[in-house]
């Protein structure tokens, strides 16, 4: 799933390549991706792209006051195309959900981007709104961890008295906007905390170290992706992960085997030596199979 660093990098890429262009055409071969119908996609036609920003994991393309807001969900992606085919894509065929044609006002070639989604879950979501906060997910977002307002005291307030597992608090978008499954694993490994530890049980020292780890992991990922083309961001993310998606491989810190806990639609990874005093966490999916 694209998280804060990847969306931040896509924002930077689109600021460079899309701002100043004019929306020539919007095609929605995957009509299921469109979550709003007023204004319609045709309302974007003829509007100049004036800005691009991020709200948590949401990407917001501002077309002269009308906003194309995208949530890439777990398997969605934005693919920039320097030369879009003139023929309209077939409805409902393949991974393509939306295609946005962007004209060059200086007379250069037509470019644009495709919004695609792998798999069958169909969670890629696109909203066309006059105010980004009309998108329910944006309206509910918590604080951005890269914002100046996100301080160690703010984090302490989110965790204090919270009975949820610390992993759950970190990935709750109404608490902290933009941190997801992958980078929360990285943060917890960095600070040496079990993902299952109750958030309210963290000491002041734990909270201080967790705050620094959130900042370092996210800013480090953003810095590594700086200047990369959209097509290269996935590979960069994978290469920078030290525990997430590395089940069965040695921990880069201590050499122990990275373990996994599986859930219905996702999994987390951790190092027993670094995070759980050498004790493997119960894999709930395996436990259900053995019943």
Tell me what each language-model feature is.
Residues 22-39, 53, 78, 154-291:
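Basic, nucleic-acid-binding surfaces and adjacent catalytic neighborhoods in DNA/RNA-processing proteins
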Residues 68-190, 198:
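Phosphate/anion-contacting hairpin/loop surfaces
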Residues 1-4, 145, 149, 203-211:
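Generic detection of long, well-ordered alpha-helical segments
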Residues 1-116, 120-124, 266-270, 275-291:
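A cross-family signal for N-terminal binding/gating loops and helix N-caps
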